[in-house]
Curated annotation (Swiss-Prot):
Residues 17-29, 45-63, 108-128, 780-824, 914-932 have a biased composition (Basic and acidic residues). A motif (Nuclear localization signal) lies at residues 16-32. A mouse model of DRPLA with 129 CAG repeats (Q129) exhibits severe neurological defects similar to those of juvenile-onset DRPLA patients including age-dependent and region-specific presynaptic dysfunction in the globus pallidus and cerebellum. Progressive shrinkage of distal dendrites of Purkinje cells and decreased currents through alpha-amino-3-hydroxy-5-methyl-4-isoxazolepropionic acid and gamma-aminobutyrate type A receptors in CA1 neurons is observed. There is progressive brain atrophy. This is Atrophin-1. Transcriptional corepressor. Corepressor of MTG8 transcriptional repression. Has some intrinsic repression activity which is independent of the number of the poly-Q repeats. Recruits NR2E1 to repress transcription. Promotes vascular smooth cell (VSMC) migration and orientation. Signal peptide: none annotated. GO terms for molecular function: protein domain specific binding; transcription coactivator activity; transcription corepressor activity. Phosphorylated in vitro by MAPK8/JNK1 on Ser-724. It holds the Pfam family Atrophin-1. Widely expressed. Most abundant in the brain. Residues 503-553 are annotated as: Involved in binding BAIAP2.
Length: 1175
């Protein structure tokens, strides 16, 4: 979805790229949407198609279409199956997200409205929106569903799909939405879910903060508070709205900045907000209305606010409704921005804020109240529709889309959505909202088109009547805002787009944030004159307003009108123009383009297929067309919200009110579609639509203008929800009665009828058969039962045995651990005290490291004698195998200090084979017991403490002068210790043996341990032998080795020093002792630290190649011959002690050192052979 959205964004960004495809895509989208829509309902499908077409045209981008289709489908599906199938919802949502095109959104919108209508006119609107988005944006559901959530989930918004997945969230969002929709809990909830989801995405997107749908809604409402309604709606559709209205500034203040301006708007629109409260109340009264109040708070406020807004707008430059709108846009934008910004999180709620704003907007629209009103109408309806559509569009396209649908769902959601939805989908949602409104006006398709055009062309905008007013302003602003918004959107939104349309909007804080804030922005937008025209447009406008505020107040106006779309500048660009396109290019792009383009497309589509689109309006144009019709339709659907809410207040008959508002602006114009739909039918249809929206009729009613087409689709849409429920209703078959009577007998079985369902029956669930005793079937069953029983018994026995074995193993492990601890303690006590600080911890490691260095350094191996390599072959399978790179061969070689190894090797190898064998067997048994599972854990723990000290001591003591003298010991110990974790630890594990080496398999560890134990036993038993080895053989061997390997080792040491990995490995491991000394502090410590991990790798790779060659070399070569000799002599006593301690330690931690043993053994054999050679 995100990709799609981005793509959409890109498309949108491309400007009209989306738009161009709009018509064609529109059709295609329609077709596509149809599938999604179809899923939803015939009507829905059509509407969806139309909307999708528009949306797709806008969003056409694969994402858009898919999103559209999915969005629509989902929305529809959600609406219909919202209650019936949350899963479906999710599916739908997924579906929706895929399309998530404005069309889809529209469809969703329309569907949402219809579906919502099904559930509850207004609520359904909201619900659908909520639900659809919810469903549709389960992942983003909350996003859309909950304005708050949406906002909060604003980011989710970008990923509609996620919203998809979070169907669950939709409910939450739904619920939050409910709060948001405080008006219509029931519808609210689903709407909330839906709306919120839609919106949230937007909201979320750009308003991640408002995770809480409530906040969002509150914001929305608070934003609306700006429109009073917002706050009010959350408070209570009525009281809250009224309070909001009154407290709009205050409430609006919830997002003070946005609210403040909105309050201004809101203040201006305060009346509207009060209207909105009425809307809320009415909405509350009318479910459709209720959500609309919530949703429509903008709308409703929009409606009332149109007057207020007018003031606001006037204040804002609402006079022109366009000019004012821009200012309102600006003002709202500030609001929106403030609100959007501040309320961005609340942004979704901002929708309501927008609502207030829209109210103000409507006033602005007051100039063009008709259009604005119409938008309010449309906005209300359209807003709902547009919101829905927008939401749908946005939701589809974006979470915003969802958000949009959300607010189309309910205006609060729309607002929210616009804000929330639109925030994410700002431009688009806004545009869609506006476009929808625009297109809602498209009821006068012209307006839709005009709207689109207006968006695109301010000129056409005027024709859009109310929308025109809003849109004309919007167009101008659209471009302006679109552009600014675009800029904002682009600039801000552009980046944010991915994040969320809203964010970009949000980014373009000014208006984008606000558009994102869309809700806030919407609030702004709402204040936006067009806001009134489009409540949702106010959304849009808010968005735009935001945008407008941002860049172009006009855009704001446009924003309002287009803001839905423009809100996402994207939307606007398409709808409005290039800027819109540009705006739209950016995140909103998909939405915007979808919105804008779709707006254009949708508008065009609406214009073109206002009937179809209107019908489809719910689906797509319904965003606009639907918005218009939706204004009618939504008005009808939402109008209830609006009408009941604000409309009642402002336009009591939202349709009428809307009409009033819309008609004021361009009742005729806007009215044509919206009034037509909204005014006449809308009032009825509005409430009815919203109300009826649930019922397909409502939808159509919703779109009287759209009626032809929209009615067609909306009914289908509405039917779809029922359809979904119908299956649940499933069948008329009488309830099953338990009869348990034999119904049939065959040779082998007797069939009993367990349940009697009257004329229906299910062989699977209603009948069961009992095999006759003598039959084959009975025998088979008996055999099967017996077999199962036997198997179960056997399994139980085996399990018990395994349990006992595990217990034994655990006991052995514990014993091993205890022994290991004891040996570690001894080793630590012995060595740690002396070299504990610097060598103590590291000592064990260093010894291992030498070995590991040896094993680790392939160069040594490569250069080393073939004989060593051959010898290493013996151990290679375990020790050297890459799989066992942690094997002793690594560390095994280094596991026992090279010095010790050298000393021990002679003793081990020189010791009587038979004795050694016996010792090995004894040690093997001992090790096996200890090694089992216990050491693996302890070793790691001990490794740093014990393993490190022992080996570290060894290496350092051995090379005590060298290692300790350089001071690397200290570094080593600590660097090792610190870095020891990874590097040293592995080395320790390697050196310490299997116990410390988790990499080794148990078998490998045992083998290594055994070898190590043997060697250690041979050597350990005879300290003198070990000393002898240390002093004599090791030196002897080392000398010869030193000569043969010294170059290599030194080179390696140098390489190690120079090479990050090698320095660690070489200095520490291969040439670790000498190298360490030569490159003691810097190279070794640092390499170790930096290469703890690397060394492991190096050990693994180089070890394989050079572990054995290195081992002898590492013993002798790592240090210069002189160094080694000096170290060995100087520390021969120390080495002896270390050897003993190490042996003890190893014995205690056989696993640790065992593993090294195999490698060591090879190493020893190598050393022995080599020593023999040189010797």
């Amino acid at each position: 979805m995100k990709t799609r959205q981005n793509k959409d964004s890109m498309s949108m960004r491309s400007g009209r790229k989306k738009e161009a495809p709009g018509p064609r895509e529109e059709l295609r989208s329609r077709g596509r949407a149809s599938p999604g829509g179809v899923s939803t309902s015939s009507s829905d499908g059509k509407a969806e198609k139309s909307r999708q077409t528009a949306k797709k045209a806008r969003i056409e981008e694969p994402s858009a279409p898919k999103a559209s289709k999915q969005g629509r489908s989902e929305e529809i599906s959600e609406s219909e199956s919202e209650e019936t199938s949350a899963p479906k919802k999710t599916k739908t949502e997924q579906e929706l997200p895929r399309p998530q095109s404005p069309s889809d959104l529209d469809s969703l919108d329309g569907r949402s409205i219809n579906d919502d209508g099904s559930s509850d006119p207004r609520d359904i609107d909201q619900d659908n929106r909520s639900t659809s988005p919810s469903i549709y944006s389960p992942g983003s559901v909350e996003n859309d569903s909950d304005s708050s959530s949406g906002l909060s989930q604003g980011p989710a918004r970008p990923y509609h799909p996620p919203p998809l997945f979070p169907p669950s969230p939709p409910p939450p969002d739904s619920t939050p939405r409910q709060p948001e929709s405080g008006f219509e809990p029931h519808p609210s909830v689903p709407p909330t879910g839906y709306h919120a989801p839609m919106e949230p995405p937007t909201s979320r997107l750009f308003q991640g903060p408002p995770p809480g749908a409530p906040p969002t809604h509150p914001q929305l409402y608070p934003g609306n508070a700006s429109g009073g309604v917002l706050s009010g709606p959350p408070m209570g559709p009525k009281g809250g709205a009224a309070a909001s209205s009154v407290g709009a500034p205050s409430g609006g203040k919830q997002h003070p900045p946005p609210t403040t301006p909105i309050p201004i708007s809101s203040s201006g629109a305060s009346g509207a907000p009060p209207a909105k409260p009425p809307s809320a109340p009415v909405g509350g009264g009318s479910l459709p209305s209720a959500p609309p109040p919530a949703s429509f708070p903008h709308v409703t406020p929009n409606l009332p606010p149109p007057p207020a807004l007018r003031p606001l707008n006037n204040a804002s430059a609402s006079p022109p409704g366009m000019g004012a709108q821009p200012i309102p846009g600006h003002l709202p934008s500030p609001h929106a921005m403030g609100q959007g910004m501040s309320g961005l999180p609340p942004g979704p709620e901002k929708g309501p804020t927008l609502a207030p704003s829209p109210h103000p907007l409507p006033p602005a629209s007051s100039s063009a109240p008709g259009p604005p009103m119409r938008y309010p109408y449309s906005s209300s309806s359209s807003s709902a529709a547009a919101s829905s559509s927008s939401s749908s569009s946005s939701a589809s396209q974006y979470p915003a889309s969802q958000a949009l649908p959300s607010y189309p769902h309910s205006f609060p959601p729309p607002t929210s959505m616009s804000v929330s939805n639109q925030p994410p989908k700002y431009t688009q949602p806004s545009l869609p909202s506006q476009a929808v409104w625009s297109q809602g006006p498209p009821p006068p398709p012209p307006y839709g088109r005009l709207l689109a055009n207006n968006n695109t062309h301010p000129g056409p905008f005027p024709p859009t009547g109310g929308q025109s007013t809003a849109h004309p302003a919007a167009p101008t602003h659209h471009h302006h805002q679109q552009q600014p918004q675009q800029q904002h959107h682009h600039g801000n939104s552009g980046p944010p787009p991915p994040g969320a349309y809203p964010h970009p909007l949000e980014s373009s804080n000014s208006h984008h944030a606000h558009p994102y804030n869309m809700s806030p922005s919407l609030g702004s937008l709402r204040p936006y004159p067009p806001g009134p025209a489009h409540l949702p447009p106010p959304h849009g406008q808010v968005s735009y307003n935001q945008a407008g505020p941002n860049g172009p107040p006009v855009s704001s106006s446009n924003s309002s009108g287009s803001s839905s779309q423009a809100s996402y500048s994207c939307s606007h660009p398409s709808s409005s123009q290039g800027p819109q396109g540009a705006s739209y290019p950016f995140p909103p792009v998909p939405p915007v383009t979808t919105s804008s383009a779709t707006l254009s497309t949708v508008i065009a589509t609406v214009a073109s297929s206002p009937a179809g689109y209107k019908t489809a309006s719910p689906p797509g144009p319904p965003q606009y067309s639907k918005r218009a019709p939706s204004p009618g339709s939504y008005k009808t659907a939402t109008p209830p919200g609006y009408k009941p809410g604000s409309p009642p207040s402002f336009r009591t008959g939202t349709p009428p009110g809307y009409r009033g508002t819309s008609p004021p602006a361009g009742p005729g114009t806007f009215k044509p579609g919206s009034p037509t739909v909204g005014p006449g039918p809308l009032p009825p249809a509005g409430p009815s639509s919203l109300s009826s929206l649930p019922p397909p009729p409502a939808a159509p009613t919703t779109g009287p203008p759209l009626t032809a087409t929209q009615i067609k689709q909306e009914p289908a849409e509405e039917y779809e929800p029922p359809e979904s429920p119908v299956p649940p209703a499933r069948s008329p078959s009488p309830p099953p009665k338990v009869v348990d009577v034999p119904s049939h007998a065959s040779q082998s079985a007797r069939f009993n009828k367990h349940l009697d369902r009257g004329f229906n029956s299910c062989a699977r669930s209603d009948l069961y058969f009992v095999p006759l005793e003598g039959s084959k079937l009975a025998k088979k069953r008996a055999d099967l039962v017996e077999k199962v029983r036997r198997e179960a018994e056997q399994r139980a026995r085996e399990e018990k045995e395994r349990e006992r074995e595990r217990e034994r193993e655990k006991e052995r492990e514990r014993e091993k651990e205890r022994e290991l601890e004891r040996s570690v303690k001894l080793a630590q006590e012995g060595r740690a005290p002396v070299e504990c600080p610097s060598l103590g911890p590291v000592p064990h490691r260093p010894p291992f490291e030498p070995g590991s260095a040896v094993a680790t350094v392939p160069p040594y191996l490569g250069p080393d004698t073939p004989a060593l390599r051959t010898l290493s072959e013996y151990a290679r399978p375990h020790v050297m195998s890459p799989g066992n790179r942690n094997h002793p061969f690594y560390v095994p070689l280094g596991a026992v200090d090279p010095g010790l190894l050298g000393y021990n090797v002679p003793a081990l190898y020189s010791s009587d084979p038979a004795a050694r064998e016996r010792e090995r067997e004894a040690r093997e048994r001992d090790l096996r017991d200890r090694l089992k599972p216990g050491f693996e854990v302890k070793p790691s723990e001990l490794e740093p403490l014990h393993g490190v000290p022992g080996p570290g001591l060894d290496p350092f003591p051995r090379h005590g002068g060298l290692a300790l003298q350089p001071g690397p010991p200290g570094l080593h110990p600590f660097p090792f210790h610190p870095s020891l974790g990874p590097l040293e630890r592995e080395r320790l594990a390697l050196a310490a043996g299997p116990a410390l080496r988790p990499d080794m398999s148990y078998a490998e560890r045992l083998a290594a341990e055994r070898q190590h134990a043997e060697r250690v036993a041979a050597l350990g038993n005879d300290p003198l032998a070990r000393l002898q080895m240390l002093n004599v053989t090791p030196h002897h061997h080392q000398h010869s080795h030193i000569h043969s390997h010294l170059h290599l080792h030194q080179q390696d040491a140098i390489h190690a020093a120079s090479a990050s990995v090698h320095p660690l490995i070489d200095p520490l491991a291969s040439g670790s002792h000498l190298t360490r000394i030569p490159y003691p502090a810097g190279t070794l410590p640092n390499p170790l630290l930096p290469h703890p991990l690397h060394e492991n790798e190096v050990l693994r790779h180089q070890l394989f190649a050079a572990p054995y060659r290195d081992l002898p070399a590492s013993l002798s070569a790592p240090m210069s011959a002189a160094h080694q000799l000096q170290a060995m002599h100087a520390q021969s006593a120390e080495l002896q002690r270390l050897a003993l301690e190490q042996q003890q330690w190893l014995h205690a931690h056989h696993p640790l050192h065992s593993v090294p043993l195999p490698a060591q053994e090879d190493y020893y054999s190598h050393l022995k052979k080599e020593s023999d050679k040189p010797l």
